[in-house]
């Protein structure tokens, strides 16, 4: 049995894909373009551009992933699987595949042999610095060949580059949008909080592949520090000069899952909480998933019984919901817009208030009755005011704003209407910060990591703020729906040729489809000529239609596109901290 197992492992270790020639890691049509380009093409220049946005409230794209692409793919992978392999092996592999799946003509290796003999990729990539937010329609990087006659190579690499970079750029852009929302509400409701810890990444299990998970979580970590994806930290260490032993690259929190909670059985659920809090994790942070059976019972029964143990721990207990509508679970289904709160008002004073004060405070539509919902503590009062009938000097009757009688119906607000944060405050108390928002003690909090979309984080934060609850009372987890439910077309990425030298003559080239008139966007139209990328306030814009001579002029000396890769060598090697600070203007 052991020998058979080892034989199988040995067989499966030696796969074709593991050592795939990168010149085969392309779309089929790329293989014939060296034959199809205009004769005597010497140089080609192409630009990578986000042509559009399908993500709400996003009009700028975060540059991220280039350094990893260069190190892992354009340098290491090309060296191992192309330049460092015998040409005979490379050619045989290429011809075997292309001749039998495309055409014999497509399997021509004349240009590939020249490239292999050269020993490096004769291209230059110039890019905006990573962490820069670039306006939609502005080029983010440029690719050109550095050796005459290799113009065909520029766009041959498009597929290989695109598949490795559109996703980290998209994820970094989405994560930044979450951070914008976090910053807005932290500024409004939180004193002394840490916005970078507000959202964790929970996406790995739902991503389409390991590498996709690593990239997406690494992109998330440009704007936040929390992640459940351990390899993302290693990925950033490998490619972005950071060290998790010396700085916060990413961090996790000890957390339970439902198999842990259900292993105690329903009858042993309270013992599960007690054992975890008092015996297993008496110190440090601990997140406990709490909806295995009855989430509300945990909040209103178990936690009050464990209040003393939780309060004396050196660390934070975080209660995690994992089902239902996250907005209602966290904030309560009763919204602040559904009632009014009157400072200092008691139950005994409701009638007197609405007889003498309401007309000065709340709108009335001139009818015989007006209705209000008043919240005092955990009770809701339905107030009906009956207005006086009177007449004017002409004898015409009408209802006045004078209230003759007030009726009140009282009911207790349910635990579902109060929601997680309010229930935790009822057990553990709260303080009111300098901005007037309620804050749980440092040893208790809430977390929710299911279905937290961009729309939902905004709604959760708004409803918290409306109830005068600081948004730092809850941590939110961003999952694979957010980071996987995207495509290259979410931001319209493409690489298009715009400039060339043919037989010694410069030519500006472009794409402008007459049929590209969907909703008047014309988004498939490319730039023309060389591009100068510049900053205008908060915007990163471009000027097109330039020549090589133009680019030498002083007015174009500060092009934001800076060379990062040339002839097989990395030219700029930045660290994670630099990129984070650039993205967040020093306020990561």
Regions found by a protein language model. Name each.
Residues 3-63, 67-68, 525-588:
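Extended hydrophobic packing segments that form well-structured cores
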Residues 285-287, 316-320, 443-447, 473-477:
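Structural preference for beta-strand elements that scaffold enzyme active sites
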Residues 335-343, 403-420, 458, 483-523, ...:
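C-terminal helical cap(s) of enzyme catalytic domains, especially alpha/beta-barrels
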Residues 387-392, 399, 486-549, 554, ...:
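Hydrophobic, secondary-structure "cap" segments at the distal end of domains
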Residues 467-493:
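Glycine-rich phosphate-binding active-site loops on the catalytic face of alpha/beta enzymes
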